[in-house]
Structure formats: C-alpha cells, structure tokens
C-alpha cells in the first residue's frame, strides 16, 4: 500500500471512506525536511493530537475516528504503524492555517520590533520579548506546499483568500476560524499551564466534513505545531527554553553551513524534550 500524499512529516493513505494519517519520525524546520530522523517523534505527535482532540471536542469536532491500529486495515497492523497512525474523516481542507499567539516570540516579535504590529494588528508600545499578550491574537497564514513558505496575512486578507476557494463563504469561514482558534487556544493554554507548560503560540488546520461543517484536521497542539515553554522558569525579556523543535531551529540558525543535518546530540535532546512535554501534559508515559 502506498501513500496518496507525503507531507513534510506525514504520509496519508486512502482507506475508502476515510484516510489513514501516519506521522513519521522526520523533522522539518523553516519549511525544510531535515536529513535526520527523530525516533518516537511520530508517536508523540499522534498521541498528543489524540489527547487534545479528546479534550476539545466540546468546542469543535475533529477528524479523528480512531488511533488504534486494530480498527485499521491489516496493512497497518505492523509495528511501524502502531502508535503513530490515526484513522481520520476525509475533509475538504481550508487553505488557511489558524495561528494564535498568546506570548511575544518568533516572527511576531520580529515584526513588532520593526513597526509595532503583528500581521497588521497594532499592539501597545513597550512590550518585551516573551511577554504575555493582553489577549491572544489571531494571525492567519496561507498554507504552503513542500519547498514553499507559509505566508502570514491579515484577517481581511484571509477573508479574500477563503472567498477565492469558497465563493460567498469567505467572511463566514474566516470568522469561524478566528473564533474557534482563539477558543481552542484559551482552553488548552489554561489546561497546559495547570500542568506546568506555557503554550506560547500554536497553529490549527481546519476542513469541511461531508455535511459542510468546519472541523479540526491535521495535528493539534504538538511540539511540531506549537511553542511549549516550562512555566517554572518563565521570565520575559528574552527567549525562553522550550519543549519543542525550537531547540533544533536555534542550532540551525547558529550553524548556517549545516546542510540541513543536525548532530546526533541535538537529535537526542530534541526527542527528550518531545517526550517530556507529552508526559507533563498528559500525565502518562508514552507507550
């Protein structure tokens, strides 16, 4: 059986009226797939997404049918698929990523330093790197194909972008994505903080199910799609240590002649951070 689509990290298989989504151990940074594999990373991504899908279904349904390979075709009942595979509903994916920022970091901080705005949103003067924002802000982006870069856009641009693909629905879908993105973030950020983790920012992907309802697709609140900071050492005014792939990003930035290959010790530290975040958030050891 061959995947019908290979993303930066995931492989997608057609299962008739559903899809099987397999999270590989590949790692991507700056929209580039690195040459390394990070053992168990795919399992962390799948099991963490499952955890959040279960926690947030009262806010918005999601595409997960089952994360148990026993519910999947025989081909997937092999060790390499156990734990990192999810059977999902087929969705018509929306061409916008719902990005939400609760703290000042990354490209949002860089933009603010230039002109005091983030994706066209004017923010108060005097904010510091890693500050908690007065309210979470929604900064959508377009979705790039492999090799291209996602593009941050304004809310108004997201309406126009959605309108191109779904005539007559741009405003409705843009508002729903914004409102759901912020509601999901608030609930999950509060929960994570109670477990000792700050969710600085994250992104969600959405699609339409067979009845035309907007549901959450792809992954949810993983170390690949989010910035997780340890709450016990949080101190605004500078960058924060993290439980996500920021560790790998920082090494790549500091070593520009890297040929997109991480040293083994960086790979090991990266997976340890992924595992630690999973255990802190769920209260369970990864099986």
Regions found by a protein language model. Name each.
Residues 1-145, 258-287:
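Active-site loop/lid in soluble adenylation, ligation, and acyl-transfer enzymes
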Residues 30, 109-110, 211, 225-227:
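Intrinsically disordered, low-complexity acidic/polar segments
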Residues 100, 199-220:
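Conserved metal-phosphate-binding beta-hairpin within the catalytic cores
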Residues 114-118, 122-172, 216, 220-281:
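Anionic ligand-binding catalytic core segments
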Residues 168-200:
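A long amphipathic alpha-helix within ATP-dependent nucleotide-binding catalytic cores
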Residues 18, 93-95, 195-199, 211-214:
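Coil-to-beta-strand transition motifs
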């Amino acid at each position: 059986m061959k995947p019908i689509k290979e993303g930066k990290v995931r492989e997608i298989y057609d299962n008739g009226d559903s899809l099987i989504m397999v999270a590989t151990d590949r790692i991507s940074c700056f929209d580039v797939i690195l040459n390394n594999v990070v053992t168990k990373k795919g399992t962390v991504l799948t099991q963490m997404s499952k955890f959040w899908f279960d926690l947030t279904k009262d806010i918005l349904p999601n595409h997960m049918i089952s994360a148990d390979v026993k519910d999947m075709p025989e081909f997937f009942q092999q060790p390499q698929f156990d734990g990192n595979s999810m059977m999902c509903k087929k969705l018509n994916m929306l061409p916008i990523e719902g990005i939400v920022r609760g703290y000042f970091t990354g490209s949002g901080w860089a933009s603010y330093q230039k002109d005091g705005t983030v994706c066209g949103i004017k923010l108060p003067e005097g904010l510091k790197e890693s500050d908690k924002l007065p309210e979470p802000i929604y900064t959508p982006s377009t979705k790039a194909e492999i090799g291209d870069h996602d593009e941050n856009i304004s809310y108004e641009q997201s309406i126009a972008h959605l309108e191109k693909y779904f005539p007559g629905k741009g405003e409705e879908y843009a508002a729903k994505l914004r409102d759901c993105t912020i509601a999901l973030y608030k609930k999950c950020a509060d929960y994570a903080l109670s477990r000792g983790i700050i969710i600085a920012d994250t992104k969600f992907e959405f699609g339409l199910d067979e009845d035309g309802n907007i549901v959450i697709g792809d992954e949810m609140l993983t170390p690949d799609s989010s910035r997780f900071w340890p709450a016990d050492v949080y101190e605004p005014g500078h960058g924060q240590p993290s439980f996500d792939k920021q560790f790998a990003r920082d090494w790549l930035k500091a070593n520009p002649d890297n040929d997109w290959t991480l040293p083994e010790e960086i790979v090991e530290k990266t997976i340890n951070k992924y595992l630690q975040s999973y255990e802190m958030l769920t209260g369970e050891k990864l099986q």
